[in-house]
Every structure is written in C-alpha cells, then in structure tokens.
Curated annotation (Swiss-Prot):
Gene: saeA
Name of the protein in its database record: Putative ESX-1 scaffolding and assembly protein SaeA
Protein origin, superkingdom: Bacteria
Compositionally biased residues, Pro residues: 89-107
Organism annotation: Mycolicibacterium smegmatis (strain MKD8) (Mycobacterium smegmatis)
Function: May be involved in assembly of the ESX-1 / type VII specialized secretion system (T7SS), which exports several proteins including EsxA and EsxB. Involved in DNA conjugation in recipient (MKD8) but not donor (mc(2)155) strain.
Region (Disordered): 1-23, 87-134
Note: DNA conjugation in M.smegmatis is unidirectional with distinct donor and recipient strains; mc(2)155 is a donor strain while MKD8 is a recipient strain. Mutations in a donor strain that alter DNA transfer do not always alter DNA transfer in a recipient strain.
Basic and acidic residues bias (residue ranges): 1-21
Phenotype seen when the gene is deleted: Loss of DNA conjugation when disrupted in recipient strain (MKD8), no effect when disrupted in donor strain (mc(2)155). The recipient strain does not secrete EsxB.
Length: 692
C-alpha cells in the first residue's frame, strides 16, 4: 500500500490546478467535442485534461499516448491549443551538456526533463512518477499490444496468463537474458503507461494472480515487458506493451426458474453496466457460437428477464453476460449460466387443415406439431363423441369416445417448413371408404399413456356431374345436367376454349342451388357467354364444418353463336305489286367479311330452307342508291357491322308473289350451327299486295 499511496499522491499533487488558466479553455474544447458527437463523455473525462496539464507534456505523440484510444485522434488539436495558451515568455538557455560524452538526444516525440539545478521558467514542469525501480516511461508513438491476456476468474482471485515473450527479428542480436513482466491494472480506463497503474505482479513467468476484489464495472489489465542483459539493464530499458485484457464484472445473485412454461431469471447487475445480454442455448448446441441464441434484445435486463417463448419439453442453458461499452466496443463479462429443462405439456392440435383433392377422392391433412408428444390422426364416419375435445384422457378411453384402433390413419408422416419459418406436419393422399359421403378427421396428441383430442374437421365427397347439355336459343343458353349426390350447389366457371381446369380457374362464375335448378329446369344464361365461344367447367359444392368444399370438375365446350338480323323494305308499283326489295343486315358484333346469303321466294308460303323456293336476283347498291354490280343469286357483305347501315343490297321482285326469306348459304352443318339469322316481322316478308 505504501507504493500505491505514493502513486496516488504523485498523480494528485496538493497544488490546485484549477488555477491553471489553460484548464477552462481545454474544458470548453472538450465540451465542443462531446456536443458534436466526436467523443463520448465517458471516454474523454476532465481527469484526462488535468493529467496532461500536470505532466507538462506538449508534444503531439506524448499527448496521444496519454489519451484513451477513442480520443487519441484529437491529440494534435489539443497540442495546438496548448501551444496557443502557453505564455510567450523567453525560454532560458539550455544548460551545457556534461562532458566527456553526452547522452544521445531523444528522438522526436520523446520527453526529457531539464538537467539543471534551476527550475525551468515554464510553469508546466513534469511531475515525476514513481516507477518501482524502473526507468520512467518515455512517451513515443501509441503502442498496440501483440497478444491477449487469458483471464480466468476463480472464487478467490483472477488468474492471468499470456504467451511467453519472443524477441522481434530486429532485436534478435541483442542480449535479452532477463525478461521482466510488469502486470498492471486500472479500473474504468486503460492506463497509458505502466507507471501510474496498479502493479498486480512483477514476474518472470507468463502468468500472474490478482486477488483484489473488482468493484468497478470494467478492469483493464496490461502486461508490459522490460528486457535486458541483466536485471539492472532491464529496469533501465523502456517497457513494451505486450498483452492486454478487459475484464467486465459479472452479475451476482443469478437465479433461474421455470413457471408454467415460462423461464424467469433474476440477478443484480453491477453499477455502470449498461445492459445484460441473455442467451437461450439448446443443450445440444452449448459449444456453438452463442450469438445466434441471444434473446430479449430490446430490453436492458439489468435485474433479470422473463422468457415466454421456450419450447415445452426442451432443455436449455441460459447465460447472462454484463455488457459495457469500452472505447466504442461492447465488452461482455464471463457468463453466469444455468440449465433449465421445461416439462412437456399435453397440447391439442387446433389448426388441422383438410384440403380435398380435385378429383374429390382423397385429401391432404396438415397441422402444426405440438411441443411434446406425437400426433395420431383418426378417420371416422361420424366423428368422436361431443365434448371430448381438449380434454386429457387415458389412451384406453379413446374407444369410449368413438376412436377405435382400426380408424387410425397409418400413412407415413412428413414435415416441412412453411414460408413463415414454422414447421408443419403433413399427410398426403388420405382416402376413405367409397360408400362414405363424408369423413371426419380427428387429431389426437399422445404422450405416454395420456391422450388429448384436437379440433375435428370433416371432408365431403360429392358425386360427379354427368350428362351435361347446353341448349342454344336465339337469346340465351340453358345448361342442364344430372344433379350430383351430396352437393348443396353447383358452380360454373367460364374459361377460354380448351382450358384445363387443373391449371386454375379465376374467370367469371355462376352458382345455382338445387332449389333454383329444379324451379327453372336448369341454369339459364342470358347474354353471359361470349359470342366466340368458351369452355364451361362445373363442380359440385358442399359444406363441411363451416368450410366450403368444391368437388371434381366436369367440363363442356361452347362453340359460340354469331347472331345476325336483317331487315327488308319492299317497293311496289301503283297497283300494289312488288317491284324491288332493299335488304340491310347487322351483327351482334363487328365481323370482317361475311358468309354467303340467298334470298328465297316461295309463292305458296314462307320458305323453310334455302332449297324451299327459288333464289331471287340481287345486286349491291352504291352510295347514290344505284346498282353497283351485275345481278347475282348470292348476297355477300364486305363486313358485318353492329349498325347495319354501311351496305345495302337490292332484289328484283318483278312478277313475284308469295313470300321471300333470307338464308345463310353455307354447306357445312357445323358452321351453320354457330350462326343465327333472325327474321324481321313476317309481314315485311310478304309480297302479296296489301289490297288483295
């Protein structure tokens, strides 16, 4: 303690340095750095400014060595301020160098005390620092340790060790018979040299023990090496920073316990610790990097934690490490740790999903596996007894609720990870007896001799839609089919021609119930189907457990229908006999070109077909109403339009009587089926004079 007392006395001399006029400007400069965010208040303290003023050092590198690492970059600016604040008093002449041989002048950045009996004129004289028999440390460039000190805390002390010293290549020729390790420590801030720090040990072995109790949150350890041909030479040599370590004080009163599936930790964090990092490590992975298992990162956890997300039935090792920011780097203490094994709880499956296949003959089941136990799926025709869900039962009581061993599904189970990162168990292609129209699936969690039923879901198997017919009328279509067994309704999707429903259906759809189907004799589609045709895909719809279940699809093609409508205006002579007829045609949609048409005359009745009478001579008219071409037996428009006023044809009715009617002149019955030619009012097709 005597040496330690001398050290404290030397570092804090009795003279009042608050009287130093340079302190106030330096404090203002420090505050500017803090306010701008360039340095942290805890990294650059007023004590550092006082230490530099007491030392009397003004060289940049000397000041840099005395500042913390995160502040060292501002040493040049501090030296400039000191130079500006130093009074411009004349310096005394340096004393003569003693003979016969002067010692070498110190290089740039070295400090040398004046060798004179008279005190220097400047007021910033160097205050000698006790060195325990070693030469005072001379500041040069900032030193960086080559090695780390291995620190091991025991119940009574801290054990320190480091690699044995090896001379660098440029000193291999020197005699370094003596290697002295000076192990020093300092709380809160790293010492800038071994002189002002607490001497832990002076040893020739690469190890030491520190028996002092740590009371500050951070303790810095340094190993400085003095080497020489003898002990005296080694003590006179300048020390070299060889190894360093930072020891963060751990938590105390560490306690861990489980409470109903949660894990609760309690401790006391030392003063000055900013946060405690908590890790939950699976017991099988305790040797892996623990950083990935850190939890509760949003809180400081200074007094403990509550972990609400451990998995029941698992065993974990919980670790707590105090965290302190040291020169911009987060340092962690050694871990306080304990193992916790959470008791497995019997939990029901509540998110069973049943997906019926497109053919309706099978289904896929999926669910989230519970934390403990295994899940068995039971398939039944009527489901388990009411009130058995989420109740713990002996496995032997499953038969009493209707779940007998032969109802258990024995297919292989697979597991997959969903897009949200959660595990899902899956059974694919599960079928049930063909005579069942409905099947109930019940998940049962089994653990030891205990069982718990989860949520039961059902799947419905509807009949296949057959005998589909689409009847075409002039202004609508009527869809008929055999109503499928077990269906509450039938849905019809429209899709392009040739579309495979297995590729997905997202177009227009229509749905009809059994009551509506029987009332109207089918599904009536008025103006709903495209003129160019489409495919219709029908599927039965049923409901199971509030879920909508769509059965297998059946399809039919609709070729489409082009609706045309013509108008006839008959011209007559003064006696009322027909002479000419003007014919106009319009389409339901614009079509380039047109098929051939024939105007047929039958003197007895309205013509029934293109062959029921005689064709009438026709010719197109130009814009002035004159014949634009020679007469022919066939009409053919250049384009069919929705307006019908773009092109007119004229017919020669001289000497004709009875009736006329326009027909599509196409030989292919298949093509005829996609064109509907609508007649005008019958009276407009009659040639007989109105007076007759």
């Amino acid at each position: 303690m005597g040496e330690r007392g001398e050290l404290v006395s030397d570092l804090h001399p009795s003279d009042d340095h608050d009287a130093d006029p340079r302190l106030a400007p330096l404090l203002a400069w420090r505050q500017q750095l803090v306010d701008s965010g360039a340095v942290a208040p805890r990294s650059f303290k007023e004590a550092h400014l006082r230490l530099v003023l007491r030392s009397g050092r003004t060289d940049v590198e000397q000041i840099r060595a005395m500042l913390p690492g995160s502040v060292a970059e501002h040493a040049e600016e501090m030296a400039r301020i000191l130079a500006e604040l130093t009074p411009a008093a004349p310096e005394p002449d340096p004393p003569p160098v003693p003979e016969p041989q002067p010692e070498p002048e110190p290089g740039p950045g070295k400090h040398r005390s004046p060798e004179t009996d008279e005190p220097p004129v400047a007021t910033t004289t160097e205050i000698p620092i006790p060195t325990t028999g070693f030469a005072p440390f001379q500041f040069s460039s900032q030193q960086v340790a080559l090695h780390d000190i291995t620190v091991q805390r025991t119940d009574a002390a801290v054990e320190l060790s480091w690699p044995p010293y090896e001379a660098p290549d440029d000193e291999a020729a020197r005699d370094i018979s003596v290697v002295m390790y000076r192990v020093v420590s300092s709380d809160d801030q790293a010492p800038y040299s071994p002189d002002p720090a607490h001497l832990v040990a002076l040893t020739e072995e690469p190890k030491a023990t520190d028996e002092r109790q740590q009371v500050s949150p951070v303790r810095h350890y340094q190993v400085w090496v003095n080497v020489g041909a003898s002990e005296a030479a080694a003590r006179k040599a300048q020390p070299v920073l060889y190894a360093t370590a930072v020891l963060v004080r751990p938590v105390t009163g560490f306690e861990i316990r489980e409470d109903a599936g949660w894990v609760i930790g309690q401790w006391t964090a030392p003063p000055g610790v900013t946060a405690v990092h908590v890790f939950r490590v699976p017991i099988d992975e305790v040797d892996r990097d623990e950083a990935q298992y850190r939890i509760l990162t949003a809180g400081e956890n200074l007094a403990g934690f509550v972990d609400t997300e451990p998995v029941r039935g698992q065993r974990y090792r919980y670790r707590a490490r105090c965290a302190v920011n040291v020169d911009g780097v987060v340092r962690l203490s050694e871990a306080a740790e304990a193992d916790v094994e959470l008791a497995a709880a019997l939990m029901p499956v509540t998110d069973l999903v049943v997906e019926t296949a497109a053919d309706g003959a099978s289904c896929d089941l999926s669910w989230t596996p519970p934390a403990g136990g295994q899940v068995a799926i039971y398939r039944s025709q009527n489901g388990p007894s009411a009130g058995a869900e989420a109740i713990e039962l002996p496995q032997g009581a499953l038969e009493q609720v209707g779940l007998t061993p032969e109802l258990r599904v024995t297919q292989d189970l697979t597991e997959e990870t969903g897009s949200d990162g959660r595990r899902r168990a899956r059974l694919t292609g599960v079928t049930w007896p063909s005579e069942w129209s409905r099947a109930y699936f019940t998940p049962v969690t089994l653990m030891g001799e205990r069982a718990m039923l989860g949520r039961t879901l059902s799947s419905v198997r509807t009949g296949t839609i057959r005998d589909i017919e689409l009847a075409e009328y002039c202004n609508k279509q009527v869809l008929t089919f055999d109503w499928p067994d077990g269906a509450a309704s039938v849905i019809v999707y429209l899709a392009p021609k040739g579309h495979d429903p297995r590729s997905g259906l997202n177009g227009r759809s229509f749905e009809i119930s059994l009551e509506e189907y029987e009332r109207y004799g089918g599904m009536h589609l008025t103006g709903q189907l495209p003129v160019g045709g489409c495919s219709l895909h029908l599927a039965p719809v049923a409901f199971a457990g509030g879920r909508r279940v769509v059965g297998a699809f059946s399809s039919i093609e609709y070729r489409g229908l082009l609706r045309l409508q013509y108008a006839v205006r008959i011209g007559r002579d003064p006696n009322g006999f027909p002479t000419t007829a003007t014919i106009a045609l319009r389409a339901e949609q614009n079509v380039p070109g047109s098929p051939g048409f024939v105007l047929v005359n039958n003197p007895q009745r309205l013509p029934l077909s293109v062959h029921d009478g005689h064709p009438v001579d026709v010719a197109p008219l130009d814009a002035r109403g004159q014949l634009a071409d020679h007469p022919s037996k066939e009409l053919r428009w250049s384009a069919l339009t929705t307006s019908g006023d773009g092109e007119l044809w004229a017919a020669n009715l001289s000497g004709l009587q009875g009736w006329i009617r326009l027909f599509v002149n196409i030989g292919s019955p298949a093509q005829l089926r996609v064109i509907a030619l609508l007649d005008p009012p019958v009276e407009t097709l009659r040639l007989t004079a109105a007076t007759l």
